[in-house]
Amino acid sequence: MTTGLLQGKKGLITGIANNMSISWAIAQLAKKHGAELWFTYQSGVLEKRVKPLAKEIGCNFVSELDVTKPKSISNLFDDIKEKWGSFDFLLHGMAFADKNELKGRYVDTSLENFHNSLHISCYSLLELSRSAEALMHNGGSIVTLTYYGAEKVIPNYNVMGVAKAALEASIKYLANDMGENNIRVNAISAGPIKTLASSAIGDFSTMLKSHAATAPLKRNTTQEDVGGAAVYLFSELSKGVTGEIHYVDCGYNIMGSTKL
């Protein structure tokens, strides 16, 4: 086992859907660095996928979490308080948009989809952070996942880009609020990665090809790339870093254009 950047730390990992999830890659590396973990799953269907993954790396705590239901959130943190007392880091890894409205024009987004997308993808970070703050007795680190579509228009991203933009603004305000308790809040802006969530994005294979061709490192981002960045942000190595968008996209975001 890799020793210690997170030795003795406890962390809550949300957003695992299967073994291709970015949250799963982050969890694996956090465990290798000594962390004790608590997983969540969104529904009974995902429970069947998440529990075997938890068992695979010796994660003894797995709970249901539906961020659209306040009682589900309070039940989770009551359990954490009872079992752990306190904990050290939180990964906010969930996002949602109606895949049917990721096609076509953003202007045609329905009110229901806009509300659900912003609630699950952004407001849930506030709710989880508020609950986590009360249990991060010795300070802590909160990390969420974002994407370049928050800053620039990406085809077939639509309302999710707006939700990620709101998420990125939120981390700055949360970082300001929670800094007095030595809790850091940051986001990782990862390049496009093939996951269950990304399968809802139209023409995703073209996005991957374009990213690899444009990025200075001439490849696509991997789950492991993001996992390493997350471990850094969870650990004491980043104790002076908060309110930041940390790019893990092989340099794609620095490019103004491709070679002519």
UniProtKB/Swiss-Prot annotation:
Residues the record marks as active site: Y147 (proton acceptor), Y157 (proton acceptor)
Keyword terms, alphabetized: Fatty acid biosynthesis, Fatty acid metabolism, Lipid biosynthesis, Lipid metabolism, NAD, Oxidoreductase
Keyword match Membrane: no
Positions that bind substrate: A97
Enzymatic reactions: a 2,3-saturated acyl-[ACP] + NAD(+) = a (2E)-enoyl-[ACP] + NADH + H(+)
Residues bound to NAD(+): G15, S21, I22, Q42, D66, V67, M94, K164, I193, K194, T195, L196, A197
Function: Catalyzes the reduction of a carbon-carbon double bond in an enoyl moiety that is covalently linked to an acyl carrier protein (ACP). Involved in the elongation cycle of fatty acid which are used in the lipid metabolism.
Protein name, UniProt field: Enoyl-[acyl-carrier-protein] reductase [NADH] FabI
